[in-house]
Regions:
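Bacterial N-terminal signal peptides
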Residues: 4-15
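Short non-domain terminal segments
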Residues: 8-9, 103, 405
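Long, low-charge, small-residue-enriched segments that form tightly packed helices used
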Residues: 351, 369-548
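Active-site bordering "gate/hinge" segments
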Residues: 18-356, 361-366, 382, 480, ...
Length: 548
């Protein structure tokens, strides 16, 4: 009776904005009650109480269907399960026990159902463990600061930016539909396509997905819920060249929900094109000599350049040096300086959910720390770095949160990392796409070259590289070309940039759903392509059964 009465009072206090259904009501009530108890009473004699505490709970289900040569090899639909995590900090906003500044999380199992008592019990268990770990970390941090004094600027920097109280419930706009029988039939048909390509072995086609709801309650009165969903259809296969080199490649189609996948006929076309490209690569001539000159990067190769330089570690993300450790690579010291070609402007969108007809999976309304991000942020303005993406841990150059903490897509833990929503690389006065190849040929002729290269994907031995004859513009696909790294210095000034834009969705660092709007091609000078020497493998004693 006491529990029912307290639950009713909770509903009246938080109102319909928080509680959308009975399940949500029970989960939030359990999290809030146990959080308040821990904040008030969790302390060992003579030790500090936590000043910050957050509980996160994820309810999720997963599925996977995999097939090979027309037969299903794995079909799995897991029921709803639960996982939780606790983040606990001692001290105050200026000085916490955190030494690494990447978030301190401790995970715990959770029931699949909204069981009030079980949820409270599990958060009680994990909070006790997190508190004891925080005490050890606080002592270790104190010792580390004595032996590794901070600069005056570092010492004045708070360890955490305060969050404003907020209640934000985000529900999936469309149900996540898992039709295992349908996907078994689809995967059978798609994987059977490889029966027509006897030189491709160890092929497979599959689809997997995650449907998750994340609940969060903090001691700062942040109450939030948001969905994290995706479905990924993949195909892979291997070929061996006549000289004994193994080449593997993969295809990936990423959407928010299984029902958002292209039609069966379109999927067949994509898998067939993938198989055809793998066969063309197998039979292509090898790169014969060293090349240094202009190279046109198109499509996936163009996106790789921007992702590798701007969106990986050391890119457009604020960085706080861990206590007692050497600093890592970061662009923060270049704020106010030119880092890329002045025709390029880089923006980050958070709420934009569609661009040029393509859904953007990087869209979100509230970040994983309860901060509402700006809908649009200019990170690089005409080549000049203006600001970085950041969470609530301030850095020397970025002392505020941009609302860029994103939940990591995994069913094994509830953690977050700094990541973009949708990055838009805008081009000022770009060149029409159909003129980019002409610009490549002209640049090659100006250097007295007989040929140049177009790179359409960068994937090791499976890279798609094309040799272009400057006389007639004809293209010949080649293989085993080792393309030199394209770093920021290379894109600080480029020869030409396409005005055409491509849109892609991807999982950044295999963690966070993100989207990228980028130039379809970029022409870069002084790129080296050399003949690589891939490892050769011995032929199997017996041939692949389809080759017999």
């Amino acid at each position: 009776m006491i529990y029912i009465l307290s639950l009713l009072i909770f509903f009246l206090l938080v109102g319909p904005v928080v509680a959308q259904n009975e399940q949500d009501q029970v989960i939030f009530k359990a999290m809030q009650d146990e959080l308040q108890r821990n904040k008030a009473e969790l302390a060992l004699p003579g030790m500090d109480k936590p000043f910050y505490l957050s509980f996160s709970l994820g309810r999720f289900r997963q599925f996977e269907v995999v097939g090979e040569l027309g037969a299903i090899t794995n079909s799995l639909e897991l029921p709803w399960r639960g996982i939780g995590s606790s983040q606990l900090l001692l001290g105050d906003y200026n000085n916490t026990n955190d030494t690494r500044f990447v978030g301190q999380f401790m995970k715990v199992g959770m029931p699949a159902e909204a069981d009030y008592d079980m949820i409270r019990r599990n958060f009680w268990l994990v909070s006790d463990a997190a508190y004891k770990m925080a005490l050890r970390e606080a002592a270790a941090k104190e010792a580390a600061l004595k032996s590794n004094p901070q600069t005056p600027e570092e010492a004045q920097l708070p360890d955490l930016v305060k969050a404003e109280p907020i209640t934000k419930i985000v529900e999936s706009k469309v149900p996540y539909e898992i039709d295992i029988k349908k996907w078994e039939n689809t995967i059978r048909e798609l994987s059977a396509i490889f029966k027509n390509y006897k030189e491709i072995y160890n092929s497979s086609v599959g689809i997997s997905g995650l449907d998750m709801e994340v609940y969060k309650q903090t001691s700062e009165d942040v109450t939030m819920k948001q969905p994290v969903t995706y479905a990924n259809l993949f195909a892979q296969g291997y070929v061996t060249t006549e000289d004994g080199v193994r080449i593997g490649d993969a295809l990936s189609i990423l959407v928010a929900r299984p029902q958002d996948m292209p039609s069966l006929e379109d999927l067949k076309k994509k898998v067939t094109a993938f198989a055809e490209n793998l066969m063309k690569l197998r039979n292509a001539p090898v790169v014969e000599e060293f090349y240094s000159g202009p190279v046109l990067f198109e499509d996936g190769a163009s996106s790789s350049i921007f992702v590798n330089n701007l969106l990986n570690q050391g890119g457009l993300f604020a960085y706080r040096k861990p206590i007692g450790q050497a600093g890592g690579r970061t662009l923060e010291g270049r704020i106010g300086r030119k880092i890329i070609d002045n025709r390029l402007t880089v923006k980050n969108y958070t709420s934009l959910d569609k661009y040029d007809g393509t859904p953007l999976l990087g869209a979100y309304e509230i970040d994983a720390e309860g901060v509402i991000p700006e809908k649009e942020m200019t990170l690089v303005d005409k080549g000049i770095l203006r600001q970085m993406l950041n969470g609530r841990v301030p850095s020397l150059k970025t002392q505020h949160s941009t609302g860029s903490s994103r939940f990591v897509m995994t069913g094994s833990d509830i953690v977050y990392t700094t990541a973009p929503g949708t990055i838009h690389i805008q081009v000022d006065k770009g060149t029409k796409q159909d003129k980019m190849k002409k610009a490549l040929i002209k640049a090659a002729k100006d250097e007295g070259l007989d040929y140049a290269y177009i790179v359409r994907s960068i994937a090791g031995p499976a890279s798609r590289i094309y040799k272009v004859d400057v006389k007639d513009g004809s293209e010949t696909q080649v293989r085993f070309g080792d393309v030199s790294a394209i770093n920021l210095a290379k894109i600080k000034r480029v020869l030409d940039i396409s005005s055409k834009e491509n849109v892609s969705n991807y999982i950044l660092n295999r963690q966070v759903l993100s989207s990228l709007i980028y130039p379809a091609s970029v022409l870069i000078e002084d790129v080296e392509i050399n003949k690589s020497e891939p490892k050769k493998e011995k032929e199997p004693v017996l041939k692949f059964p389809l080759q017999r």
